[in-house]
C-alpha cells in the first residue's frame, strides 16, 4: 500500500509504502507533465534511487535533499499507516 505524504509547489507528489519486514520503505515521486508523468523511486534508509523517468540529475538532487530532510517522518509514518493515521485525523 502507498500513502500520500506531500505535494510540492511544482505539483510533484511524494508517497511512501509501509515499512517492509527488512526495514525498507519505498518512496515514490511523480510529477505531472504534458503527455504523462515524470517519476522516480527511492528506497529508504539506503537512499537507493531507481526507475527514474523524466527527471533530470538536478531534479533528483533536489528531491534527494527533500527526502533527507523528511526521511525521519516518512520512516515513522510508514509504521503508522501513513500521515493520516499517525496524526489521528
Predicted regions and their residues:
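Compositionally biased, intrinsically disordered low-complexity segments
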Residues: 9, 17, 28-30, 69, ...
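Negatively charged, low-complexity tracts enriched in Asp/Glu with abundant Ser/Thr
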Residues: 1-16
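A short, structured beta-strand/loop element
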Residues: 15-56
